[in-house]
């Protein structure tokens, strides 16, 4: 259950913090952005209101994510927790129409696979 502003305990000391970049959100996008900026030498502060890992519906990674995960040095960890995904299928609400897309048939033939992961495990990495 989320706390209301009056229930949040402030930090014992308030200090003026300076940075080059303030990243709001520590999920996959925010933490990746903060990591890449810090690698470039920027002073980064990342702010996240939630506690991680937390329950969240699964994360459906796309093939274009794979090179970035390699660059971040976490590809092997993702492989251990992920279920290999070679494509996606879309179904209409009435299930009368479907569309199957195989990643190997997409615009970049080199990016032919991805993973489906549990978000809580993904957040830990």
What are these regions (language model features)?
Residues 22, 38-59:
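Glycine-rich FAD pyrophosphate-binding loop
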Residues 2-8:
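Short gly/ser/thr-rich secondary-structure transition/capping motifs
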Residues 92-125:
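Conserved N-terminal helical subregion
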Residues 32:
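Conserved SAM/SAH-binding loop-helix junction
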Residues 12-29, 45:
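Beta1/beta-strand and adjacent pyrophosphate-binding region of the FAD-binding site
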Residues 54-95:
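N-terminal FAD cofactor-binding segment of flavoenzymes
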């Amino acid at each position: 259950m989320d706390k209301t502003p009056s229930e949040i305990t402030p930090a014992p000391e308030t200090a003026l913090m300076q940075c080059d970049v303030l990243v709001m959100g520590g999920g996959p996008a925010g933490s990746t952005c903060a990591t890449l900026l810090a690698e470039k030498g920027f002073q980064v502060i990342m702010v996240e209101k939630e506690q991680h890992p937390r329950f969240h519906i699964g994360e459906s990674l796309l093939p274009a994510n794979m090179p970035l995960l390699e660059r971040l040095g976490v590809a092997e960890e993702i492989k251990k927790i992920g279920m290999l995904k070679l494509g996606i299928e879309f179904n209409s609400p009435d299930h009368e129409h479907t569309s199957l897309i195989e990643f190997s048939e997409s615009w970049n033939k080199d990016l032919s696979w991805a993973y489906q992961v549990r978000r809580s495990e993904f957040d830990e990495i």
